[in-house]
Amino acid sequence: MFDRAQSTIANVDPEIFAAIEQENRRQEDHIELIASENYTSPAVMAAQGSQLTNKYAEGYPGKRYYGGCEYVDVVEQLAIDRVKQLFGAEAANVQPNSGSQANQGVFFAMLKPGDTIMGMSLAHGGHLTHGSPVNMSGKWFNVVSYGLNENEDIDYEAAEQLAQEHKPKLIVAGASAFSLKIDFERLAKIAKSVGAYLMVDMAHYAGLIAAGVYPNPVPHADFVTTTTHKSLRGPRGGVILMKAEYEKPINSAIFPGIQGGPLMHVIAGKAVAFKEALSPEFKAYQEKVVENARVLAETLVKRGLRIVSGRTESHVMLVDLRAKHITGKAAEAALGAAHITVNKNAIPNDPEKPFVTSGVRLGSPAMTTRGFGPAEAEQVGNLIADVLDNPEDAATIERVRAQVAELTKRFPVYR
């Protein structure tokens, strides 16, 4: 039926092929600094493009609603076993299609509409799914938000006071734009003191945690959710780790609760990524991720920019642009013209609108994947500062773009 030689994307759909080729060129030619993006391996992509995409497999390994699942059972069980080993978890569900759906799965399993949850404020670095009023989590539940103190660290004392006052059923830890280490043990004690579950969303930090360069929340939390891309460098998807006592309700919440048939080709990609993350090379990579982020932040500070929280202890940093009298939206556009990709991001107590912002968020995972070290991280920091010092100067943009081209040529993503 299908001739592999003839059924190529280029032959079947030249328009899609052209868009893919253009995106590949963009990824090779631009320096990627969006903290939630990374480059996955050819092995992971091959798994995602395999015949496993053809197979329906409602249920779980050994308990499927379809026949012919003996081989996809092997794939899913390998993914489960590997991710449990990677993070030291008692149980795992690898079927969530995203980090948001992983969070929804925990909510669906353990909460009822109207229950009180407590999460980090989106305005202070949290995530939409931690109780934002525009998200399902903020519409279905009564939300209490904690945030940062005057030093721009998590205000654990205020969080404890809020928990004592409001008695949430579930406390959410984790962030999407917070650079310091989170004290998961302290948050677990707060949760225990009020009889709340603790759910940690480690989506941004998962790769660092797997390598032991960031605190592991698994020993302290009832549930730990994550994406499988970002710093973990796998396919786009989600995972829930949990204590064994919660495995049955979580599994039921994912299927049949909020999802149908799992994406077995993506689960295969997850399994491959987990195997890669168990390697010594992955630990060395994550150590470089943290070092590159530190060098990048220090370089920006030397050039007159402020890092929210004063520093980074992870892969990510939030840059306050107000001293340069430029918005996040304008900075994103200017840097993009120089082939440096970032995202505009609100800073704590940001006076600008969400589509404008006073900051940008930067991350080091992708540039580290392509081989950048501290010297390149310092160079990138100076290139960013050069653009932000003269964001409307065409000559500056052209000069920086030429230096970016030299860097990306030296360090290709896919050889």
UniProtKB/Swiss-Prot annotation:
Pfam families: SHMT. The modification N6-(pyridoxal phosphate)lysine is found at residue 230. It is an enzyme of class 2 (transferase). SUPFAM superfamilies: PLP-dependent transferases. PROSITE patterns: SHMT. Its main location: cytoplasm. Signal peptide: none annotated. GO terms for cellular component: cytosol. One of its GO terms (biological process) is glycine biosynthetic process from serine. Keywords: Amino-acid biosynthesis, Cytoplasm, One-carbon metabolism, Pyridoxal phosphate, Transferase. Its cofactor is pyridoxal 5'-phosphate. Its EC number is 2.1.2.1. It is found in: Cytoplasm. (6S)-5,6,7,8-tetrahydrofolate binds at residues 122, 126-128. InterPro entries: PyrdxlP-dep_Trfase (IPR015424), PyrdxlP-dep_Trfase_major (IPR015421), PyrdxlP-dep_Trfase_small (IPR015422), Ser_HO-MeTrfase (IPR001085), Ser_HO-MeTrfase-like (IPR049943), Ser_HO-MeTrfase_PLP_BS (IPR019798), SHMT-like_dom (IPR039429). Pathway: One-carbon metabolism; tetrahydrofolate interconversion; Amino-acid biosynthesis; glycine biosynthesis; glycine from L-serine: step 1/1. Catalyzes the reversible interconversion of serine and glycine with tetrahydrofolate (THF) serving as the one-carbon carrier. This reaction serves as the major source of one-carbon groups required for the biosynthesis of purines, thymidylate, methionine, and other important biomolecules. Also exhibits THF-independent aldolase activity toward beta-hydroxyamino acids, producing glycine and aldehydes, via a retro-aldol mechanism. HAMAP family: SHMT. Homodimer. Belongs to the SHMT family. This is Serine hydroxymethyltransferase 3. The gene is glyA3.
